[in-house]
């Protein structure tokens, strides 16, 4: 078990207090025990932190000052890891402890896997049961592909990427290093492209061949049952470090920048470009052919129908979307709309009665 001193050095935190024992992992404030670490990154949980039984807390300097001045009824002897960003330090420490419990996929190929003779599969890879790997596929070192996943022809998957069961990766897809793709994801299906050919008596929708690729950069995580369509003629691109939640739809020719986060059930229409470091809430949706500036935040269920050109703005609203501050003001007015209506009726009644 790592000691407090070892953890403080590894995660560049200042250590306050002494712990005679090591730590087994992390836990929530209300459940943590003396051999576990918890964290405080929200003022609302200060009192709960003061009463926690955790043997160590990751805190900011201001939170440490509060906790030392308000020890709480529990009065547990604990140590503090003082960090500039407690939440980020918690995340990195959680990664550290999780590695000890992560399943290790031993290298080797399950006998039920079907691998084309032209595919390149290094000996360090793990290929699970009933996996299909097509012609011309190239896998990097230590790639793990779990059961029932399918990798179609000429796709390239770089080293240390993990693909969970029942993932479908279509042809010519490019996936970078250290990516994680969860079950049910479909990468590289045809984009939704059809041209109308109608007359007064009938017609049809003419399918446009989708000849582009999906290109996924390094350190991307893609949630369960998310779908990313291949480009029509150019590529659909996901930037490095971007994290995509479950059941997200990304249409053809979309470009998502680096280090974005996209929450569940969001939908991005074709040819829209999302900047770097954007935050997209759950079930937010974007019209096609838009450009979204860097560091834009879009609240959940918000509809974006116009490009956003100024970086760092926060948009909220079903229709129309607007700056978050303006939406809050309008929402407050909307809550009092019935009272305003009653007052106007009374004023109108008094006016008509001459009083």
Swiss-Prot record:
The active site is at 252 (proton acceptor). CDD domains: LbH_LpxD. SUPFAM superfamilies: Trimeric LpxA-like enzymes. InterPro entries: Hexapep (IPR001451), Hexapep_transf_CS (IPR018357), LpxD (IPR007691), Trimer_LpxA-like_sf (IPR011004), UDP_GlcNAc_AcTrfase_non-rep (IPR020573). Keywords: Acyltransferase, Lipid A biosynthesis, Lipid biosynthesis, Lipid metabolism, Repeat, Transferase. It holds the Pfam family Hexapep. Its EC number is 2.3.1.191. One of its GO terms (cellular component) is membrane. One of its GO terms (molecular function) is N-acyltransferase activity. Pathway: Bacterial outer membrane biogenesis; LPS lipid A biosynthesis. Gene3D superfamilies: Hexapeptide repeat proteins, MurE/MurF, N-terminal domain. It catalyses: a UDP-3-O-[(3R)-3-hydroxyacyl]-alpha-D-glucosamine + a (3R)-hydroxyacyl-[ACP] = a UDP-2-N,3-O-bis[(3R)-3-hydroxyacyl]-alpha-D-glucosamine + holo-[ACP] + H(+). Homotrimer. Catalyzes the N-acylation of UDP-3-O-acylglucosamine using 3-hydroxyacyl-ACP as the acyl donor. Is involved in the biosynthesis of lipid A, a phosphorylated glycolipid that anchors the lipopolysaccharide to the outer membrane of the cell. PANTHER family: UDP-3-O-ACYLGLUCOSAMINE N-ACYLTRANSFERASE, UDP-3-O-ACYLGLUCOSAMINE N-ACYLTRANSFERASE 1, MITOCHONDRIAL-RELATED. Belongs to the transferase hexapeptide repeat family. LpxD subfamily. NCBIfam families: lipid_A_lpxD, PRK00892.1. This is UDP-3-O-acylglucosamine N-acyltransferase. It comes from Polynucleobacter necessarius subsp. necessarius (strain STIR1).
């Amino acid at each position: 078990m790592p000691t407090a001193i070892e953890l403080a050095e590894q995660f560049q935190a200042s250590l306050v207090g002494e712990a005679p024992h090591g730590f087994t992992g992390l836990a929530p404030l209300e459940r943590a025990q003396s051999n576990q670490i918890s964290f405080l990154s929200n003022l609302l949980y200060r009192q709960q932190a003061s009463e926690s039984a955790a043997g160590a807390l990751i805190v900011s300097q201001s939170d440490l000052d509060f906790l030392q001045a308000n020890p709480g009824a529990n009065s547990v002897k604990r140590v503090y890891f003082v960090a500039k960003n407690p939440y980020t330090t918690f995340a990195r420490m959680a990664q550290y402890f999780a590695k000890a419990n992560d399943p290790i996929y031993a290298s080797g190929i399950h006998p039920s896997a079907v691998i084309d003779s032209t595919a390149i599969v290094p000996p360090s890879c793990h290929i699970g049961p009933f996996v299909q790997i097509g012609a011309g596929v190239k896998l990097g070192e230590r790639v793990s592909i779990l059961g029932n996943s399918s990798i179609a022809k000429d796709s390239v998957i770089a080293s240390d990427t993990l693909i969970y069961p029942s993932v479908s990766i279509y042809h010519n897809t490019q996936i970078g290093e250290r990516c994680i793709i969860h079950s049910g994801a479909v990468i590289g299906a045809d984009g939704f492209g059809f041209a109308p050919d109608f007359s007064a008596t009938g017609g049809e929708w003419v399918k446009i061949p989708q000849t582009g690729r999906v290109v996924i950069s390094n350190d991307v995580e893609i949630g369960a049952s998310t779908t990313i369509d291949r480009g029509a003629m150019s590529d659909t691109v996901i930037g490095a470090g971007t994290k995509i939640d479950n059941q997200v739809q990304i249409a053809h020719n979309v470009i998502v920048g680096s280090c974005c986060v996209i929450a569940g059930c969001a939908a991005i229409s074709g040819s829209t470009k999302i900047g770097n470091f954007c935050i997209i809430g759950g079930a937010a949706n974007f019209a096609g052919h838009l450009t979204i500036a860097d560091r834009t935040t879009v609240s959940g269920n918000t509809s974006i129908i116009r490009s956003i050109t100024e970086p760092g703005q926060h948009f909220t609203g079903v229709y129309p979307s607007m700056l978050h501050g303006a939406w809050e003001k309008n929402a407050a007015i909307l809550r009092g709309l019935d009272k305003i209506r009653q007052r106007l009726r009374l004023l109108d009644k008094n006016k008509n009665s001459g009083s």
